């Protein structure tokens, strides 16, 4: 009787072990799947990519208008600015001066956009108002360095670095406004809790 009970007990132990192993196997597969999905999502969302401008020959009417304006802006006389971010990444922007001591708009484009096509209406408005304009390439975009977009985590410090550059270059008497579209707008807002120059007067945001 004792041997029979021991045999039954051993069988139960074996069954329980198998169940535990199956559960552990399922959990391991689930974790590996989640890690794979996370890695894919990170690479798709955050790793640097080279995005070409759409071909004018196949653009629809709206795209054609935006692109032709963007090409004009790109070719307008401007001053190319390169600064070093707080983590050593080289950042590039283009400064368009309309009037000395006028307010400076620092513009940040959206994720995987560029400072020209994302900026056409703003460029024309600042031109009419004779405000000076600094078009910034976000890190991991276009002319700027960096391999990863951090979706605003590090970019907000870059925003502060650009504001500091404008303040140092033109003096604290020149008003600065931070402006962005989509993720660029988020970058401008996220930078507002940092120690910005006193010449920064506000944020102007736009999102679709």
Predicted regions and their residues:
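Conserved alpha/beta-hydrolase
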Residues: 126-145
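An N-terminal hydrophobic leader/cap segment in hydrolases
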Residues: 30-83
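Conserved small/polar residues in nucleotide/adenosyl-binding loops
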Residues: 206-207
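Alpha/beta-hydrolase active-site loop
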Residues: 150-170
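Short glycine-enriched nucleophile-adjacent loop
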Residues: 185-196
